[in-house]
Amino acid sequence: MHINVRGTRKIISNVSSFTPRYEFPKYSMPLTDFKGHQVKALKTFEKLLPQMNMIIELRDIRAPLSTRNVVFDRIARKEHDVMKLVVYTRKDLMPGNKPYIGKLKNWHEELGEKFILLDCRNKTDVRNLLKILEWQNYELETNGGYLPMGYRALITGMPNVGKSTLINSLRTIFHNQVNMGRKFKKVAKTGAEAGVTRATSEVIRVTSRNTESRNEIYLIDTPGIGVPGRVSDHNRMLGLALCGSVKNNLVDPIFQADYLLYLMNLQNLNDGRTELYPGSTNSPTNDIYDVLRRLQVNKSQNEKSTAIEWTNKWRLHGKGIIFDPEVLLNNDEFSYKNYVNDQLEKLGDLSYEGLSNKLKGNPNQVF
């Protein structure tokens, strides 16, 4: 998808002569990072779904389109009785943007989806998710739904969107409730790079039976799953790269840095007090090499290492930047519902026989 955001919002610059780019070049890059262990995980999903009461799909709040996986949409539509909850992670990196949250609300209402925002390390946020699980379990029990195997939720999402961190946080809360004073051991590996979890984990208990519920609640952690090349494009791949949802070396760091610069200038987050990059307040630029020269702390630092350092800083700690340019479009210029339906049409009907060949495809294919 080639996005032109010209005219979609008023761009105000402290430098009146500066005009941001409204289109981003199509650099040559892989468009998918789909791997063999992900195919195996998807086959496992099909077997597990009849046992599940809820699918929890995690997405990065900064990239609601890039981290939405159409494969999960297809799976969820096969199991109509399974509730799906979308959880946007890294809420702390998108503070106070009410218009954006309002747009997300409208998008999900179009599709009849439920969603919440949270910081996977924030105990209050995580407890709120636990309350949702407990309430859904309570409603099921109220309608006579005793579950001998417990209430089960499958945690899914793109690589490195916070699945394992969330599970560890939920497990920590449970551990502290039943084992006061005893040391807690993580049950799911976490990391700053995509691909830490590579296999579907054992069932993880997060609540016990009590006077209010006969059902225990269990979670199943899963590896991050990418998308096939035919439902990806340059914007999606660059958005995933900035989120850390693909391997660092898959997309050229200069391309990533240039995309970040493009998004920064488009969104005009500059409030006149904080520099997004050196000179952004007084001398904004569309030239990524100019920005990299400004960022270099010494002459021995090359452009790629500077680009990696800058994008990593924003990936981990940068606040307020949206990584999907479609979010900047007006409602009459971009339809979320049409976007999702188009993705489903491109994906087609999937059977799990021969799934490896169907999904892997050519990493550079765009159809």
Curated annotation (Swiss-Prot):
Keyword Nucleotide-binding: yes
Listed InterPro entries: G_CP_dom, GTP-bd, P-loop_NTPase
GO-annotated biological processes: mitochondrial large ribosomal subunit assembly; mitochondrial translation
CP-type G domain sequence ranges: 42-228
Cysteine-cysteine disulfides: none
Family: Belongs to the TRAFAC class YlqF/YawG GTPase family. MTG1 subfamily.
Name of protein: Mitochondrial GTPase 1
Record organism: Saccharomyces cerevisiae (strain ATCC 204508 / S288c) (Baker's yeast)
Primary gene name: MTG1
